[in-house]
């Protein structure tokens, strides 16, 4: 069985992603179109059910106009 990604630390990271999206005024659908991903992917990322790699995080940071470090503090 795989290790759960639902740690408190990862949930905090996922919460920051959602908060950043809301601060930009974008919907999950709008983000999904800009990142060329399904809306369900954005939902899973924000729920902490889908991990991101470093390049994906960079793409979110650029879209949300946030410094990369905002998400990993």
What are the language-model segments listed below?
Residues 2-23:
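A short, Lys/Arg-rich alpha-helix, primarily the initiator
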Residues 13, 44-47:
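Anionic, Ser/Thr-rich low-complexity intrinsically disordered regions
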Residues 22, 33, 62:
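Alpha-helical residues within the helix-turn-helix
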Residues 25-44:
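Short alpha-helical DNA-recognition segment
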Residues 55-70:
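DNA major-groove recognition helix of helix-turn-helix/homeodomain DNA-binding modules
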